Every structure is written in structure tokens, then in C-alpha cells.
Amino acid sequence: MSSKVFLRDKVHVNVGTIGHVDHGKTTLTAAITKILSTKGLAENKSYDQIDKTKEEKERGITINTTHVSYETVKRHYAHVDCPGHADYVKNMITGAAQMDAGILVVSAYHGVMPQTREHVLLAGQVGISKLIVFLNKCDLVKEEEWIHLVEMEVRELLNEYKFDGDKTPFVRGSALKALEGTDVEGINKLLEVLDEYIEDPIRDVEKPFLMPVEGVHTITGRGTVATGRVERGKIKISEEVEIIGLKETKKAIITGLEMFKKELDFAQAGDNVGILLRGITRDQIERGQVLAKPGSLNAYHKFLSQVYILTQQEGGRHTAFFSNYRPQFYFRTTDVTGFIKLKKDVKMVLPGDRTELIVELNHPIAIEAGTKFSIREGGRTIGAGTVTEIIE
């Protein structure tokens, strides 16, 4: 863990880039850090540093979510760069769940594409209420009319998924040109809009501590570190937490807290943190579990839910499903297979239906009434739901 201390002298906001593969999310993230680094407000992160894994470099696409941090004069931002490729949507869901607001990157050259639509749907599902649209690659489009048509198409899409498409700010630019240093105006405008359009987040610090585990690392000689975004509550060093879900519940003492390689006295809702846990080995904790205040949460495998099933036009199923249907259920940072039971008076569920479902998961996970989830099958999102009642 680090020896530098994280200063809470500015409002902390979690943002991120979402959108279709190759529309420029990672290039935009790199351009933001480069431009702010010249003002001493960020560490310059190259495209290759953000697209970290060997497979990402070879395929030229983002697979895992990547976190960078930067500041404006007004705020401190934690920025998640989400994968746009359809195969890695589950990592996108994890990243989006950590955001207070999103930057939807749309190539002005290509317009709305399948993952543009899916990411907007999922952003709403995980609780993001505001998006800013960055129309990228504007330098490749010669006709102003074309950019205007793409903007109209995106506004319609936002309205369709209950975002305020009419009032959503649009910023035009070229992330690549900005990264090359020839046209930085779009990036400066985007940062200005981030500061002004996105309100200071209201943090849920009074409720019991809860953090979904996104990653797990070992520090030789120190112990095991769990990383993630604190969903609610506060925690400080020497306090006890429970590790809940997927396996038998375990207890651990917190011996260190860190955010962006700087030490914290305490962590609170909204912080992206690494938590050092005493007495826990690498194989006793995994992504998809949660850290929670002891006694505040339990793991369950059967629940009642209210669900919306997407239409074919929304990228969902083409056909109905029946009892014993077995898709994947995505909660916070985990995905679990389970099966659906329909209520006695319901014979089948059609695309476009809003319905009540009984869900039984293969593994127990930390859930409670109000927990949101996505339903996926064969690489696409087919439904969005909320837990209404725990059964067992």
C-alpha cells in the first residue's frame, strides 16, 4: 500500500466512457489525461497503459474496465473506461455500476451501433441518471448535415431509454486529434460540461457499509486486497467486515485503505478503493462477493422480482420463454446462472412484457429487496429487473 495520503479537498465524482467498440472511448480517456497532465491535474496515461492486457493490445479492443484518475479545478474524477465489445458486456456492467454519470462516445462517422444502444439501456439499469454525449471522429465527416442527423438519432435513443435526450449536452470533437495535440478544444469543452452539467453526487454514507468486490490482489507480506467502489456507508482501518456471497461467509479486519495509490483514513460511498484484509488468503475471496458491515446483509438464492423483458427491436429475444428458462443473472460485479419460475396464472413471457418472476440462482449471492439486476442470454441483454422480496 502507498505512503502518500489522498486529500479530500474537492468533490469526488465517478464518471466513465461507454459506447460501441472502436468509437474511441479509450482514445478519449487517454486524451483527457494528456491534456490535464499539462496543467498538473492528471498523470498522462497513454492508450497502451489504459488498454492493459496482452489480448487487448493484440486485438485492439478494451476487455476489462480500466480506472484512471484526474482533476479539474473544481473536482476530483475517477474515470472508468468500459469495454465496448459485445463479448465483454459483463465487464461493462461492472464498470457502469460504479459511475455517477457517463460519457457516451458515439462516432459521428458511424452513428448509433448495437452496443451504443445496449450500453444506454444498461447505464439506466445500473442507476446512471445523466449522460453526456461526445460525438467523436468529427474530423472524418465532411457534411455538417450528417453530424446533425447522428445527433438526432442519439437524442431519440436517449429518450427511448428514459434519459432526457432533449437536454443532454453534446460535445463534438476528435479524441485522436486531441491526443496528437492538434485539436484540444473538444476535450476542454467536455471537461467544462462535466463540471457544470453533472451535479455533486449525494453519497449514501449513513447506511451500513457495503462494497461489491471487483478485483482481488495479493501484496506479499501484507495480505489480500479487495478492490471496488463503495456502494454505501463508511469504513475505517481496524473495523471488521463480512465477506458475503458465493461461498461461506467469512469475517476479516481491515488493515489498510487506499485510493489511486494514496492512503485513506476512511473510505465512504463513491470511493474506488483497495481494502487490505487481515487473515484472508487469495482463494477465500473473489470478484462477485461483497464486503459488508457484519450482520447487515445475507446471501440468498431464491427471490421474487419485477422484470421488464426487452423487445426484439431493443436487442432482446425474438420469442417467448416459459418456466424453467435458464439465463444468466448479473448483480453488481457477478453473474450467476439460475432458472425462472412463472407465477401460476402466467403461461409464458413475451418480449416487451413487464412481469413478476420467481428466480432461483445456482449460487447464493448478497441481495436484498431493491437490488437491481440484468438478465442475459447468448451474449445479449434480454431483461432488466429488481428484487422485490427474498424467499430463501
UniProtKB/Swiss-Prot annotation:
Top enzyme category: hydrolase
Region (G5): 174-176
Region (G2): 60-64
Superkingdom of origin organism: Bacteria
Gene3D superfamilies, per the entry: P-loop containing nucleotide triphosphate hydrolases (3.40.50.300), Translation factors (2.40.30.10)
GO cellular component, one term: cytoplasm
GO terms for MF: GTP binding; GTPase activity; translation elongation factor activity
Residues given in the record as GTP binding sites: 19-26, 81-85, 136-139
Location of this chain's protein in the cell: Cytoplasm
Xref: CDD domains: EF_Tu, EFTU_II, EFTU_III
Segments of this protein annotated with the region G1: 19-26
E.C. number: 3.6.5.3
Keyword Transcription: no
Catalytic reaction list: GTP + H2O = GDP + phosphate + H(+)
GTP-binding listed as a keyword: yes
Residues annotated as domain tr-type G: 10-202
Annotated segments matching region G3: 81-84
Sequence positions that bind Mg(2+): T26
SUPFAM superfamilies xrefs: EF-Tu/eEF-1alpha/eIF2-gamma C-terminal domain (SSF50465), P-loop containing nucleoside triphosphate hydrolases (SSF52540), Translation proteins (SSF50447)
Keywords, alphabetical: Cytoplasm, Elongation factor, GTP-binding, Hydrolase, Magnesium, Metal-binding, Nucleotide-binding, Protein biosynthesis
Subunit-level organization: Monomer.
Family per similarity comment: Belongs to the TRAFAC class translation factor GTPase superfamily. Classic translation factor GTPase family. EF-Tu/EF-1A subfamily.
NCBIfam families: EF-Tu, PRK00049.1, PRK12735.1, PRK12736.1, small_GTP
Purpose: GTP hydrolase that promotes the GTP-dependent binding of aminoacyl-tRNA to the A-site of ribosomes during protein biosynthesis.
Alphabetized PANTHER family for the sequence: ELONGATION FACTOR TU, MITOCHONDRIAL, ELONGATION FACTOR TU-RELATED
Protein name: Elongation factor Tu
Gene: tuf
